[in-house]
Swiss-Prot record:
Residues passing through the membrane, by range: none
Pfam short name (any one): ThiF
A GO molecular function held by the record: ubiquitin activating enzyme activity
UniProt similarity note: Belongs to the ubiquitin-activating E1 family.
Pathway participation: Protein modification; protein ubiquitination
GO BP terms in the entry: DNA damage response; ubiquitin-dependent protein catabolic process
InterPro entries noted in UniProt: ThiF/MoeB/HesA, ThiF_NAD_FAD-bd, UBA_E1_SCCH, Ubi_acti_E1_SCCH, Ubiquitin-activating_enz, UBQ-activ_enz_E1_Cys_AS
EC annotation from Swiss-Prot or TrEMBL: 6.2.1.45
Disulphides: none
Reaction(s) catalysed (UniProt annotation): ATP + ubiquitin + [E1 ubiquitin-activating enzyme]-L-cysteine = AMP + diphosphate + S-ubiquitinyl-[E1 ubiquitin-activating enzyme]-L-cysteine
Gene: UBE1Y
Name this polypeptide is given: Ubiquitin-activating enzyme E1 Y
CC terms in the record's Gene Ontology section: cytoplasm; nucleus
Length: 152
């Protein structure tokens, strides 16, 4: 490793850090005192960092994981939550016991599915699909190109 060799050569410490989704890691390397950076090996990645999926997918696995996550968040999870809401009288009570912002997110998604974005006919479904496509494949791409111009 280039940086590792130069840190040893110039006797300078190296602070290496990284993230993987919600996890983070840090390694302090002090020449001739601690293990060198290149002698350690990262464990195999189990998941793809969300920043990679959202902003910089660069492998087919990233595309597949993004598509799977997108499908589940659009068609699987909301449908399961709506079905639970309609059939289980204790759904709201159980949902309110979830941690953090989850109760709000789940209940807002149920409200969105049953009230705000409920389609009444086929034309509503087509309109929703067109708007979603435009958001994902036009607006988001334009925003990424604005935030990270290709010439950088």
């Amino acid at each position: 490793m280039y940086m590792d060799r130069h840190c040893v050569y110039y006797r300078k410490p190296l602070l290496e850090s990284g993230t993987l989704g919600t996890k983070g890691n840090i390694q302090v390397v002090i020449p001739f005192l601690t293990e060198s950076y290149s002698s350690s090996q990262d464990p195999p990645e189990k998941s793809i960092p969300i920043c990679t999926l959202k902003n910089f997918p660069n492998a087919i696995e990233h595309t597949l994981q993004w598509a799977r996550d997108e499908f589940e968040s659009l068609f699987k999870q909301p449908a399961e939550n709506v079905n639970q809401y309609l059939t289980n009288p204790k759904f709201v009570e159980r949902t309110l016991r979830l941690g953090g912002t989850q109760p709000l997110e789940v209940l807002e998604a149920v409200h969105r599915s049953l009230v705000l974005q409920r389609p009444h006919d086929w034309a509503d479904c087509v309109t929703w699909a067109c708007l979603h496509w435009h958001s994902q494949y036009a607006n988001n791409i334009r925003q990424l190109l604005h935030n990270f111009p290709p010439e950088q």
